[in-house]
Amino acid sequence: MWESRSVSEQQPAVPAPTPVPEVHPVWEELEADGPQVGIVIPDEADRERIEAACNELLERAITFEVRVLSAHRNPREVAEYASTAMLRGVRVVIAAAGGAAALPGVIASYTELPVIGVPIERGNLGGMDALMSVVQMPDGVPVACMAINGARNAAIFAARILAQGAPPPAEF
């Protein structure tokens, strides 16, 4: 049968508080001179489609890098890029893709950085297939979706994201 116990016998003693470990800001370890924006395209042929984004970032004096990585042809390299981008100084990723447009979502699944997806027009569907792929990310894998071929808007949006962590401009 059941034994009768006092309250102090039934509940374990409260453990002593654990000392709080010393915390140092992780930002000090990040590469300060790295590119602020990472632009990823799945194929060298897509470079012209992101030219407007590159020009916009150059005009705004925002550093960036362009990488050619395919979610289908080299998924390990995509995972490596996305998981280490923050350590290299990247603060926002722009990922352009057409067709199945898996690239933005795959990158978002491997990083905590904001990811901006740019659907690219390819084939007979006029980019609608890519748009639907980018805009319909599963719960927990957020990707901001621009218009079809909206690379320039992606760069402007990236600049606005970066501005959130910067001091306000001296003049408006």
Spans of model-derived segments:
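Active-site-proximal loop->helix
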Residues: 54, 79-82, 109, 125-138
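N-terminal beta-loop-helix "entrance" segment that forms/cooperates
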Residues: 66-87
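Glycine-rich phosphate-binding loop
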Residues: 81-119
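Short beta->alpha connector loops at strand-helix junctions that form conserved
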Residues: 41, 97, 118-121, 146-147
